């Protein structure tokens, strides 16, 4: 750690780097995550190795890791393309073949957490989260978005797609760092404090 003031809140509260790294990994129970790891030919597929493959970088914050003695900078590790997005979202044969024959291996999909099949797509210089969703799942997300707007809340932008819902990266390419609510609440799931 070069500067404790720049640590993620998770590490300030928990001081467990391995747990923090594992929390940033793509959900291995997602079938498309397993296809992605196979296409990338990751030698080690555990959560920490998966995250280390992309220096623990994500779209929604500036936190990342650098090997000891390395001269890497954030500009070297931040993501600049969405080459593997279709494989992560759709998991179809064509997407797998394209990914498996690519020389590229850095992808924000390896740190795209959550249980739904999803991906990051770069559109006109902006990152969008595309998430597979049923009609009811789309309705609930769009309803919450519209309700929040009507109540005057500052909401992440959501749009309906065909078989998916998409949301504009509300961090604006990590101009602010997203910290999950669990970081603040810790084990206080009843919100009593």
What label would you give each PLM region?
Residues 1-193:
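Phosphate/dinucleotide-binding and metal-coordinating scaffold of catalytic cores
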């Amino acid at each position: 750690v070069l500067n404790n003031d720049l640590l993620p809140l998770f590490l300030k509260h928990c001081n467990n780097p391995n747990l923090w790294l594992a929390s940033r990994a793509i959900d291995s129970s997602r079938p498309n995550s397993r296809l992605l790891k196979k296409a990338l030919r990751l030698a080690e597929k555990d959560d920490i190795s998966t995250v280390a493959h992309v220096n623990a970088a994500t779209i929604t914050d500036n936190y990342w890791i650098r090997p000891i003695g390395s001269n890497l900078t954030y500009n070297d590790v931040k993501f600049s393309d969405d080459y593997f997005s279709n494989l992560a979202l759709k998991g179809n044969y064509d997407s797998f073949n394209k990914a498996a024959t690519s020389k590229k291996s850095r992808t924000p999909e390896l740190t795209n957490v959550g249980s739904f099949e999803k991906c990051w797509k770069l559109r006109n210089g902006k990152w969008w989260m595309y998430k597979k969703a049923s009609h009811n799942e789309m309705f609930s997300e769009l309803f919450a978005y519209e309700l929040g707007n009507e109540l005057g809340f500052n909401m992440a932008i959501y749009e309906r797609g065909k078989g998916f819902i998409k949301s504009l990266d509300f961090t604006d390419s990590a101009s602010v760092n997203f910290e999950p609510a669990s970081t603040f609440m810790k084990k206080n799931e009843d919100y009593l404090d």
